[in-house]
């Protein structure tokens, strides 16, 4: 590890820390050590792993100020937002630790009439070693949705944090080491893209990735060379649907927060709003009033921070320019709102659906508000996207009906972001927003495999699965199938 790289504070460019770049050989060694530790981690059993994970969650929250400050330094987000991220993180660790045994309990299945002499069970076992590649926007919360659940299921984990937040990743390993019964259970490796690619091809049994759709496709392709399954949590262009009967004050407050918090760097952040034309003017007026009270700035000075990844400024700028060129209008802010590394709030209205500003993920504090004649039109426009991560609905009476027609992985009715904080429900998307799930029983089962075990309880006189099967037995089977109409299985 002769080569190193630095992480910097995006607000001022100051170096936060220097970290090693793991080579492919070194990544392989770490994965090998994790595999060696795997058998002992499994032997601890659910109760033993639960104790370790609950101790870890306690250690993290007891040192919340330390890790929150590091998150703030590497991402530029306010300390209060970093604290909220940590609090939500420990909730997920605790839930996974407490529920893993129940979720993985052996299930008994009906064998069906034809195989009534058999017992049928399905067992769940850990995969072995899970690789996790994390993002920079929520550097402890998001990867923990894979890490904690994989560990609770009995896997060991090798984690590569984003090159923008390596310090957070190293802190996670150090905090785990403080309570770990032995080495190799959870290990952090640092580096750039080559290190992440090495993890994909290192022999891990599954890989979980959070990041852009473009990079996710490269990750999936690399993992495919070794037939390694993946969980991909990718980008979004999340819509907000505002019906005429919505509580506008609550809808505006939540939508503007969703769009602007964390400098708009949230995969489930509001990027496009479809509001019923009957209340559109009032909604836009309230949105402008709220946005005008917000300011981007360094932690302690702004409501939200800088763009963590410098190149994202170019994407934000190009989308705002495209929106105006294509016929949209500024309702609040202008191109002057973009002053690297900060982006002040921008509200765009009446942007054509074909514009790149509507079609592509912006990942900045920019929101588009378009009028619709009905919720039917809003649903059609919301679904007309290559993304399908989350959605928000604001309506007093139509929420469930609208939700059932949306093509996405998660929906919040009269709320925002809430599905990410509820540990018992799965998080993930469809279409170009990825596949697989984190969180909840579904998320934990991602890091297990099913083993079917069937056993003969009673030996039948009929020779069915045998070369000694007779024509009479064949006729009996067909007659039974006809009478039972498919209920043999």
Sequence positions of predicted segments:
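N-terminal Rossmann-like NAD(P)+-binding subdomain of aldehyde/semialdehyde dehydrogenases
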Residues: 1-118
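Short loop/turn microsegments at loop-to-beta-strand junctions
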Residues: 2-5, 270, 389
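Structural signal for hydrophobic packing residues in well-ordered secondary-structure cores
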Residues: 35-38, 42, 57-64, 68, ...
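Rossmann-like NAD(P) dinucleotide-binding subdomain of oxidoreductase/dehydrogenase enzymes
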Residues: 109-250, 372, 488
């Amino acid at each position: 590890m002769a080569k190193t790289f630095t992480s910097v504070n995006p607000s001022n460019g100051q170096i936060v820390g220097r970290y090693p770049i793991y080579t492919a050989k070194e990544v392989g060694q770490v994965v090998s050590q994790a595999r060696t530790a795997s058998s002992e981690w499994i032997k601890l059993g659910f109760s033993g792993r639960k104790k370790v994970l609950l101790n870890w969650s306690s250690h993290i929250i007891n040192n919340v100020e330390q890790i929150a400050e590091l998150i703030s330094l590497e991402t530029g987000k306010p300390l209060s937002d970093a604290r909220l991220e940590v609090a939500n993180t420990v909730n997920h660790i605790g839930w996974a630790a407490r529920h893993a045994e129940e979720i993985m309990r052996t299930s008994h299945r009906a064998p069906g009439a034809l195989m009534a002499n058999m017992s049928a069970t399905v067992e769940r076992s850990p995969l072995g070693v899970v690789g996790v590649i994390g993002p920079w926007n929520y550097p402890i919360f998001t990867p923990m949705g894979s890490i904690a659940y994989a560990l609770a299921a009995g896997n060991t984990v090798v984690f590569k944090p984003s090159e923008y937040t390596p310090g957070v990743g190293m802190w996670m390993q150090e905090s785990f080491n403080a309570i770990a019964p032995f080495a190799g259970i959870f290990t952090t490796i640092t580096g750039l893209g080559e290190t992440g690619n090495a993890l994909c091809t290192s022999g891990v049994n599954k890989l979980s990735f959070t990041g852009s759709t473009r990079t996710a496709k490269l990750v999936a392709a690399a993992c495919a060379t070794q037939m390694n399954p993946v969980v991909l949590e990718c980008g979004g262009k999340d819509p907000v649907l505002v019906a005429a009967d919505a509580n506008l004050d609550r809808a505006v407050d939540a939508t503007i927060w969703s769009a602007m918090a964390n400098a708009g760097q949230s995969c489930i952040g509001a990027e496009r709003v479809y509001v019923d034309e009957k209340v559109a003017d009032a909604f836009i007026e309230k949105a402008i009033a709220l946005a005008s009270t917000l300011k981007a700035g360094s932690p302690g000075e702004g409501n939200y921070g800088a763009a963590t990844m410098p190149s994202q400024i170019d994407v934000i700028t190009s989308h705002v320019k495209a929106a105006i060129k294509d016929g949209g209008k500024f309702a609040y802010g202008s191109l002057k709102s973009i002053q690297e590394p900060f982006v002040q709030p921008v509200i765009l209205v009446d942007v054509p659906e074909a514009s790149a500003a509507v079609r592509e993920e912006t990942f900045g504090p920019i929101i588009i508000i378009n009028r619709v004649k009905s919720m039917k039109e809003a649903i059609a426009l919301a679904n007309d996207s290559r993304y399908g991560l989350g959605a928000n609905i604001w309506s007093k009476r139509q929420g469930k009906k609208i939700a059932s027609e949306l093509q996405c992985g998660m929906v919040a009715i009269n709320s925002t972001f809430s599905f990410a904080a509820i540990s018992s429900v799965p998080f993930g998307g469809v279409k170009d927003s990825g596949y697989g799930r984190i969180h909840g029983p579904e998320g934990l089962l991602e890091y297990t495999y099913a083993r079917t075990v069937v056993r003969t309880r009673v030996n039948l006189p009929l020779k069915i699965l045998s070369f000694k099967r007779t024509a009479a037995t064949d006729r009996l089977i067909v007659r039974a199938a006809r009478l039972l109409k498919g209920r043999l299985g």
